[in-house]
From Swiss-Prot:
GO terms for molecular function: mRNA binding; structural constituent of ribosome. SUPFAM superfamilies: ClpS-like, Ribosomal protein L7/12, oligomerisation (N-terminal) domain. Forms part of the ribosomal stalk which helps the ribosome interact with GTP-bound translation factors. Is thus essential for accurate translation. CDD domains: Ribosomal_L7_L12. This is Large ribosomal subunit protein bL12.
Amino acid sequence: MAKITTDELIESFKEMTLIELSEFVSKFEEVFKVTAAAPVAAAAAPIEPAAEAAPEKTTFDVILEAAGDKKIQVIKEVRTITGLGLGEAKALVDGVPSKVLEGANKDAADAAKAQLEAAGAQVSVK
């Protein structure tokens, strides 16, 4: 029997379909009594179990605290951010404090806060 080089083996694998490769792996595991699964590393025990870090917050609410002097500009920005109609956006601005965005990611919350503050509003992110 002729010895097959590694390169020849790789070329053979390139010509196989995923199903054929899967069958090959199963047969290889069976013949050589090995497993192709990656070993799972055991997690190291924490040094101080009481010193667990609080999970990082992933969702944020943007809260309009006050509209400021440029109320019309703030209403326009609220409409842009939320997609609300004019009446709904005005009601949201008039009813401060009110949530402009709920459950937004950090980037979206920061961007909305910057837009509203540029329009003259007082905004908080919680």
